[in-house]
A protein has these predicted regions:
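Charged, glycine-rich active-site and insertion segments that engage polyanionic ligands
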Residues: 1-60, 74-77, 109, 145-147, ...
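Short loop/turn elements that form and flank the Walker-type P-loop nucleotide-binding site
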Residues: 36-37, 79-83, 113-116, 130, ...
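Conserved alpha-helical scaffold flanking the Walker A/P-loop in AAA+ ATPase domains
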Residues: 23-32, 98-119, 127, 131-139
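Conserved Walker B
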Residues: 124-128, 156
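Residues immediately within or flanking Cys/His clusters that coordinate Zn2+
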Residues: 40, 66-69
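Structural recognition of the conserved hydrophobic beta-strand(s) that form the central parallel beta-sheet
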Residues: 120-123, 136, 147-153
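AAA+/P-loop NTPase substrate/partner-engagement loops
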Residues: 68-98, 158-159
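Flexible loop/N-cap segments at domain edges
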Residues: 317
Length: 402
């Protein structure tokens, strides 16, 4: 078990090394040592490793006189997104454009109102467009004295080179299953056995593990995905399963956005001065249209995220199948705590049936098809077409190409 982190760092599972770097930076004086504070950071790591949590914790520590106690008003408001000198940038769109970046640059140049720094956290810095990066570059090259930029992305290569070359880099590791399970037990009160199962299924993704541990519907959806490879017998099965997966993703996204959409619409109507008589101000139609466009983009992204989770589960499933076929995992190792083992040890029977009914070459081709499906979703290909093509490929038919 890893050492338990405290204060604002408490939720950064398995990131002791990275937290050490951030702590030393908050406690150092500019220019005094190799641990000196930098005005621009690029925090990278695999999905679910806690990039945005690390950035928010760092932002809180920078505002705290005790360097991240986790108890003071500065820490609490920074972590919750309510601190006036910490700007948290999340996007539902596929990119962060130049206009949004220019507004961030303008805000970053302001003096802190209450805090010690003006901190800007960009959770999806890999989505900044080339023109947006040009607008950001000057602000990073010539920062205001108390401004700190915290950019988050999966890898340094995902960020435009002119930006990443001017940032101090910090990489987060994939948390070990034991560390994730310990967090679920300690913080969320999950039963140890369920926490261990969810942590393994989450494959180092803390948010996914928490969802599986706390949401019975999420576990049921995962079980249904685990049954999928053994029940695709015909073209009709593939088409029906693809439709079901897309519909389920749409319903999941709609449920997640319904309340937020309604609140945003009510807030905008109030701001525009909608009267009780139903009369609409002259500029209302354009403003409402813009809001609907933003909400539609968010809905599509959440649907895509839901399908991406399906693809992640299918990748892990066929990784296990390949491990069985090649002898990389022996029967006595399938449920080991670490090392060579099956991610989905609870599905061992089904995995062995699939392994026996297909060749390793077919399994590799299936994994390639899953990766191609993920890339197609990223490019905006119609989700139903993507899933139909993938499931047909999984049955052993000729692989279609997008």
């Amino acid at each position: 078990m890893s050492d338990v982190l405290t204060g604002v760092w408490a939720d950064l599972v398995g990131q002791e090394k990275a937290v050490g770097v951030l702590r030393r930076a908050t406690e150092s004086q500019p220019g005094r040592s190799s641990h000196a504070m930098s005005h621009a950071w690029l925090i990278t790591g695999p999905p679910g490793s806690g990039r945005s949590n690390a950035a928010k914790a760092f932002a809180a520590a920078l505002q705290c006189v005790d360097h991240g106690c986790g108890q003071c008003n500065a820490c609490r408001t920074a972590l919750s997104g309510a601190h006036p000198d910490v700007t948290l940038v999340r996007t539902e769109a596929l990119s962060i454009g130049v206009d949004e970046v220019r507004e961030l640059v303008r805000r970053a140049a302001m003096n802190p109102v209450h805090g010690r720094h003006q901190v800007v956290v960009v959770e999806d810095a890999d989505r900044i467009t080339e023109r947006g990066a040009d607008a950001l570059l000057k602000a990073i090259e010539e920062p205001a004295p108390k401004t700190v930029w915290l950019l988050c992305a999966p890898t340094p290569e995902d960020v435009i080179v002119t930006i990443r070359s001017r940032c101090r880099r910090l990489h987060l590791a994939t948390p070990r299953d034991e560390a994730v399970a310990d967090l679920l037990v300690r913080r969320d009160g999950i039963a140890p056995e369920l926490a261990a199962e969810a942590a393994r299924a989450g494959q180092g993704h803390i948010g996914r593990a928490r969802r599986l541990a706390s949401d019975q519907e999420a576990r049921a959806r995962r079980s249904a995905i685990g049954e999928l490879p053994t029940r695709l017998r015909s073209l009709g099965d593939c088409l029906q399963a693809a439709e079901d997966l897309v519909n389920q993703a749409s319903e999941e996204a709609a449920a997640a956005t319904a309340q937020v959409d309604s609140a945003e619409r009510a807030e905008l109507e109030k701001a525009l001065g909608f009267g009780s008589s139903g009369a609409r101000p002259r500029n209302a139609q354009a403003a409402m249209r813009d809001l609907e466009k933003q909400q539609s983009a968010r809905l599509k992204r959440l649907q895509r995220d839901a399908l991406d989770r399906v693809l992640t589960e299918l990748t892990a499933y066929h990784r296990d199948v390949l491990a069985i076929q090649t002898g990389a995992v022996r029967p006595e190792e399938e449920n080991a705590l670490r090392g060579a083992r099956l991610v989905n040890a609870g599905w061992s029977g089904a995995l062995h049936r699939v392994a026996d009914s297909h060749s390793p070459e077919h399994t590799v081709a299936t994994i390639d098809a899953i990766l191609a499906a993920r890339n197609s979703l990223e490019r905006g290909v119609t989700p139903l077409l993507v899933m139909e093509t993938l499931l047909i490929a999984m049955t052993g038919a000729d692989h279609a190409r997008w």
